[in-house]
């Protein structure tokens, strides 16, 4: 049994390592505080995404204890003060065992024997360090690690030569453990090049692949300075039911390119369940918590880090993914599925299919444990996620697994599961109409909104959508730079919000793209206002900013919008909307256009050199106010009101517009005073047709 004193010491060591990066929740809370100071509140088909590994040559359905031969394939506590001296002293107490092996030798049996000896010697007070000397070696079976072992392989290259689809390394020599996070403890793997060598495997195209290292039911795990090579249809490193882990300084490279299905993340965070993580009983649904993944390199691989399976109502917690480098990835770099209290910061992603994907639930691969009570009220919480200071360059659109793949920089989405009429699940790489049958996996039908996500100070470029929010609430998108190519065959957008509520889009710099610069669309269920504030938007092929169907009182303020191929700012169906202090110029349609917006306020905007009118309100934008605006040098009229009543147009300035200073068509103008005119066409006049002006 683990002695608490030493367990605490080792836990402190891990805590100190984790503290190299600030606690995830602290960063996110700081970001939320910053946002709060700026704004005042107003008001993949289951088969495809299942683990494609062969389950350790043992049936995942068997629950009895199984002893593996060498060739088989297969705590909560307070953080205490820690000093570097404590860590050094603890490491000095390690026992060392050196593998006696010749260059070129198969080390499977010898290393397993040495690891078993280390298991018998190691204690919580005195770990064992097992050293694989530099050299080139082969592996023909699965290695078995145990608690309190430090496996050191710097300078060694270990190459799989077995034709079987079997794991390179796992914990324990039996499927059973104490479960939860108590099965194994104090595990370190340091150094070595571990080549999965898919070329040696027979029937590569047949069902399944194999995982490199599979680590489950453990606490205090470190994997560092390891090079992982040549994966076959699965993961290099997979963790489930792991608490307190750090993966740092590792390199992941190479995969079998003839297979493009499944997730194939290099690092997969998972849960201890039979279909998705076989071979680690009990299947109690333990997930990963307190994980740091930093300073790693991923190149020429299918996907980077993340999860494509989840436990319902049991999120992965306190995940930090920082300062990693991703180069030439077919799919996404990072997938945060059902994550909570997470930071994704300082990563560089170059030539990737997608950058960061954040999703509340994925019912096609969501799981429950036997006897778990579930309801639509479950899995509803603020994710508290920060995505900041990442550099993302996205590849051209392509076809993956027979389906069109359109890239993105950042995608933040909720889900509506089967049973909500008229709704569909936002999906990434499979059918957009993809739904899950709640009777097959116990997940209730309902809306699972994504909440509490901040995307800040990211730089995104390439052939993609920039930043996307779907079914999102209480989220922020601030200070990002998005430079898109417009050579697409689809309408890529700078920032898009679909069915959003209380989304704050501020101080972003957006350019290029075939679609909208900012696209923000809500639903009749949207109860909290959205704010689009201080953004710079230029060169999009549709409207620079489109806001439609958001909560009453939503605000579009102090944005600078130019050279859009349509309108600069288009606002539709938002009552009491505020369009204030914007600069909209050189757009190929109108500077600002409102449609079906009751009781809107359009104030203090500067609109110039637009190809049609400067400001236009039409289609029953009744009881709205247009005041204090400057409309100059537009090719038609400075202001046009059509099909609306109860409009006040006061204190505006009309200068050098080629058409009329102002036009009123089939409208009732309740107040018209204090306006100024200079150098407009048609003798500086206004034009009135089938309209009534109550007061000039």
Where are these regions (language model features)?
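Parallel beta-helix/beta-solenoid
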Residues: 146-148, 153, 184, 189, ...
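N-terminal extracellular ligand-recognition/capping segment immediately after the signal peptide
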Residues: 105-112, 125-166, 173, 194, ...
